[in-house]
């Protein structure tokens, strides 16, 4: 695991693209449905339990949250989408902002698409994957909470998702458990590729 992930620090939070840092360097986004475990993945990756705020309330992340690895590289936690208990107008704004981010952010180098292994590939997951595919953006699908399923069931879900993504040339999938630190090295290696890090 590259040391820069452990040195990650909060940079800024903004409600729309207008408040984002300058469009330069490298950014990798973490996208996922509400309560899929995005914040837990970021905290596990960085070895910082409180870097990304973990909430039991779906849709708590309502801003673009930027974490700086070094002066040229950033992790971005996108607003949680899906069944978040927020007004429809807010959901509509999230959709517009996220779509704009994918299509206008030149420094975007990759996506980590976080899915709860018990509920993979919902409509919004497919939407994000289609956005990534439309701009040829490399994507790592993380099937989180794999410890919630027995090994056989987790493997079956992995294979099912793996078959679903065969038509996408820049997409890979892996199992992940923040609790057991499963899949951390695989994720780190993929992020190194996105960011141009060399071990």
UniProtKB/Swiss-Prot annotation:
Keyword Transcription: no
Gene Ontology annotations for the cellular component aspect, listed alphabetically: cytosol
Binding site for Mg(2+): 39, 61
Keywords: Cell cycle, Cell division, GTP-binding, Magnesium, Metal-binding, Nucleotide-binding, Septation
Cofactor(s) listed in the protein's UniProt record: Mg(2+)
Residues that hold GTP according to the record: 32-39, 59-63, 77-80, 144-147, 176-178
InterPro entries, sorted: G_ENGB_dom, GTP-bd, GTP-bd_ribosome_bio_YsxC, P-loop_NTPase
Family: Belongs to the TRAFAC class TrmE-Era-EngA-EngB-Septin-like GTPase superfamily. EngB GTPase family.
Name under which the protein is recorded: Probable GTP-binding protein EngB
UniProt source species: Ruthia magnifica subsp. Calyptogena magnifica
Gene behind this protein: engB
């Amino acid at each position: 695991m590259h040391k820069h992930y452990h040195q990650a620090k909060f940079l800024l939070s903004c409600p729309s693209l207008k408040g984002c840092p300058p469009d330069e360097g490298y950014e990798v986004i973490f996208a996922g449905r509400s309560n899929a475990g995005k914040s837990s993945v970021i905290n596990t990756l960085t070895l910082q339990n409180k870097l990304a705020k973990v909430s039991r309330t779906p849709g708590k992340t309502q801003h673009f949250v930027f974490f700086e690895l070094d002066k040229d590289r950033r992790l971005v936690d996108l607003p949680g989408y899906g069944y978040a208990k927020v007004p429809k107008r807010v959901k509509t704004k999230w959709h517009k902002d996220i779509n704009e981010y994918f299509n206008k952010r030149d420094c975007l180098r990759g996506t980590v698409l976080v899915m709860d292994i018990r509920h993979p590939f919902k409509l919004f997951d497919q939407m994000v994957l289609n956005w990534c595919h439309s701009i040829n953006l490399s994507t790592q699908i993380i099937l989180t909470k794999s410890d919630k399923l027995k090994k056989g069931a987790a493997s079956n879900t992995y294979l099912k998702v793996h078959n679903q993504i065969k038509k996408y040339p820049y997409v890979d999938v892996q199992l992940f458990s923040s609790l057991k630190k499963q899949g951390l090295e695989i994720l780190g290696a993929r992020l190194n590729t996105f960011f141009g890090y060399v071990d």
